[in-house]
Swiss-Prot record:
EC number: 3.1.-.-
PANTHER family tied to this protein: ZINC PHOSPHODIESTERASE ELAC PROTEIN 1 (PTHR46018:SF2)
Nuclease is among the record's keywords: yes
Species in which this protein is naturally found: Escherichia coli O6:K15:H31 (strain 536 / UPEC)
Keyword Coiled coil annotated: no
Residues engaged in binding Zn(2+) 1: 64, 66, 141, 212
Cofactor note: Binds 2 Zn(2+) ions.
Protein name per UniProt: Ribonuclease BN
Role description: Zinc phosphodiesterase, which has both exoribonuclease and endoribonuclease activities.
Similarity field: Belongs to the RNase Z family. RNase BN subfamily.
Keywords tagged on the record: Endonuclease, Exonuclease, Hydrolase, Metal-binding, Nuclease, tRNA processing, Zinc
CDD domains linked to this entry: RNaseZ_ZiPD-like_MBL-fold
Gene coding for it: rbn
Binding, Zn(2+) 2: 68-69, 212, 270
Amino acid sequence: MELIFLGTSAGVPTRTRNVTAILLNLQHPTQSGLWLFDCGEGTQHQLLHTAFNPGKLDKIFISHLHGDHLFGLPGLLCSRSMSGIVQPLTIYGPQGIREFVETALRISGSWTDYPLEIVEIGAGEIFDDGLRKVTAYPLEHPLECYGYRIEEHDKPGALNAQALKAAGVPPGPLFQELKAGKTIMLDDGRQINGADYLAAPVPGKALAIFGDTGPCDAALELAKGVDVMVHEATLDMAMEAKANSRGHSSTRQAAALAREAGVGKLIITHVSSRYDDKGCQHLLRECRSIFPATELANDFAVFNV
């Protein structure tokens, strides 16, 4: 999986940072996909500066209905239609997301020429497509807000082709059945169990993408053991009380959560517009003093999961 940050500013855009939007490129060899997490104003314009086509989007996840995470959605939906895109799109979000989208389209006399499904979610598993599952966790914010945990299922281990050939199994379709863990019967009556020729499963990757939040009970469960955790660091340590009063987190709180959850990497985003480049480096240093494996997301930054 690959993360591409389209917007990393909190509340309002700056000259160097747009408001929140994150692409997730699934990069699966047989079932690829492009997902978008939040869609602040100007997201479709940010997309133009990447190699990704809006027509490839198949799922959009909205954390909450504050404008800096949402106001780019109607324009993106309409542009997909104007471009002749017919690929279906599913939007997941909290209660009210359906009304927002339908009202914006109706009042503006707009429509979509592709199948559009809107799913209003609650806490819990959203879907499992057999390759990965997505679970929503409630966060601490003035509006109903969710973080999303994306978990790949473990992949089958490598098939020991040499051992199979030595056992008299001819390469070809039978190898595919054995790779799937099935048992086959050879012409001489022998049964070959694929599980006996498979290496240990390859653990799938796990990713946690937080919406806006102050400290909350569900945060640890959402982030526990993930390879990458994306979390806001709206304000620095000195302004922690102010951040919490508005349903946001400080650098210290983001880094402390990453350390407690045992994540592989922390990526901080949703930076207050009060911070220039020098100020952002200050935020990064504060996080790294607690959790060294921290990176600062800038617009168009790319991270592998």
